[in-house]
């Protein structure tokens, strides 16, 4: 790929009810975004990102993704990032997309490797709620932003509803199609009101189309982190509010994330981490080589080794 000729900064708008890419006139800021992406992607080109799963799992995963209309197949050649801005504005959206790892289901992400090395994933805890509260100069408190709504139950559904209410520019009288309200024993209207009650300090931000502006804020944080990891030649792979990085550099990533958020909001945010999987043991506790076991391991992952 010729990075100088590829357009990495894209602008979308809704036209006749359809999201479409639109042309735009360059500004110093769009040129900066593009140059930063060229820098990030040029570093990515020096590394190899892969998925270390057993051969028998490869076809299973491919079939699963094919059945899911919301996901794309995993194509390891899709190694570079693009920024997509929304609503015809370079102050809306701006998240980083099109890296193949963003299509990997959560339970498979532990097996993402960078330069054949095992990885860890770090993520911001409740990024959207924290940004919203800080934007209003309010403290969110220690209690989980989603669990507080239904006394700890149905957290995933509450999170979906919370984000839908922040994204919407209407009052959302009807439940969004992607939320399975039948899983809980209250109506959509009741859930909506409970979220508003639980988050009175930021109630004015719901139903105002705030979500795309918040996406721009988190995309600026992501850019900050990606530029730092590019400078240190230790690439990190973004998945919205989380990052995947080789395990030996993970502690550096955590500090980068804290600094990047603080530089944007002047406040701190919890960062959670997970050492995802441990490399296979080459030796027994007594020092005996695990030759037979490693031979089996190699055969089971031969497609990964062959790449």
Language-model segments: which ranges?
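Non-catalytic nucleic-acid-binding interfaces of large nucleic-acid enzymes and RNP effectors
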Residues: 1-110, 116, 272-307
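Surface segments flanking catalytic/ligand-binding clefts of nucleic-acid enzymes
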Residues: 214-220
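Catalytic palm subdomain of template-directed nucleic-acid polymerases
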Residues: 244-257
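Catalytic palm active-site di-aspartate
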Residues: 123-124, 235-246
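A common structural junction motif
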Residues: 260-267
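Helical catalytic core of nucleic-acid polymerases
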Residues: 94-208, 215
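Active-site palm subdomain of RNA-directed nucleic acid polymerases
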Residues: 220-239
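A generic structural motif
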Residues: 143-152, 267-278
């Amino acid at each position: 790929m010729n990075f100088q000729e590829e357009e990495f900064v894209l602008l979308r708008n809704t036209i006749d009810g359809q999201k479409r890419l639109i042309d735009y006139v360059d500004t110093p800021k769009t040129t900066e975004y593009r140059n930063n992406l060229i820098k990030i992607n040029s570093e990515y080109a020096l590394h190899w990102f892969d998925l270390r799963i057993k051969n028998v799992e490869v076809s299973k995963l491919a079939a699963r993704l094919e059945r899911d209309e919301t996901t794309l197949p995993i194509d390891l050649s899709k190694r570079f990032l693009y920024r997509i801005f929304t609503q015809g504005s370079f102050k809306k959206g701006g998240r980083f997309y099109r890296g193949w790892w963003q299509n990997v289901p959560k339970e498979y992400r532990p097996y993402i490797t960078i330069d054949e090395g095992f990885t860890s994933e770090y993520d911001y805890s409740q990024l959207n709620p924290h940004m919203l509260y800080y934007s209003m100069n309010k403290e969110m408190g220690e209690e989980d932003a989603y669990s507080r709504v239904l006394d700890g139950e149905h957290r995933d559904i509450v999170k979906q509803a919370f984000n839908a209410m922040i994204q919407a520019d209407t009052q959302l009288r009807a439940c969004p199609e992607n939320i399975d309200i039948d899983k809980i024993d209250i109506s959509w209207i009741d859930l909506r009101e409970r979220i508003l009650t639980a988050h009175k300090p930021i109630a004015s931000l719901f139903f105002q189309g705030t979500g795309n502006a918040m996406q721009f804020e988190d995309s600026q944080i992501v850019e900050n982190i990606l530029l730092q990891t590019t400078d240190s030649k230790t690439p990190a792979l973004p998945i919205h509010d989380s990052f995947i990085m080789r395990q030996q550099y993970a502690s550096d990533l955590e500090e980068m994330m804290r600094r990047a958020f603080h530089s944007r909001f002047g406040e701190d945010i919890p960062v959670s981490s997970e050492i995802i999987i441990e490399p296979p043991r080459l030796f027994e506790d007594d020092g005996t080589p695990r030759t037979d076991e490693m031979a089996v391991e190699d055969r089971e992952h031969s497609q990964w080794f062959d790449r």
